[in-house]
């Protein structure tokens, strides 16, 4: 999905850092709300549910570099833009599937 690799960092930098949303609101808009729209039982942490978690470093600024994207989609208008909120680890069903 084009833009997925930059969506959290851009959302954090442009919305949370600038006071438009709280971090909790951003997380809800990127997890709970899409799960509701898709009708899937995901988007929250609870006993007995799949542990699908993204861990991001919201303190460190980094430069978006599309040549380092994991996905095949390398097209982005944000190549070279600085942002905060680099995803460090992604866990799906309790298993680490991505580690920076």
Regions found by a protein language model. Give the residues of each.
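C-terminal cap of metal-dependent C-N hydrolases
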Residues: 50-99
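His/Asp/Glu-enriched, well-ordered alpha-helical/loop segment
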Residues: 1-58
């Amino acid at each position: 999905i084009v833009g997925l690799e930059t969506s959290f960092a851009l959302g954090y930098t442009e919305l949370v850092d600038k006071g438009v949303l709280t971090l909790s609101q951003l997380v809800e808009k990127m997890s709970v709300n899409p799960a509701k729209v898709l009708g899937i039982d995901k988007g929250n942490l609870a006993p007995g549910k799949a542990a699908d978690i993204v861990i991001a470093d919201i303190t460190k600024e980094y430069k978006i570099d599309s040549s380092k994207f994991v996905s095949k989609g390398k097209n982005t208008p944000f190549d070279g833009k600085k942002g905060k909120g680099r995803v460090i680890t992604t866990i799906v069903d309790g298993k680490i599937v991505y580690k920076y």
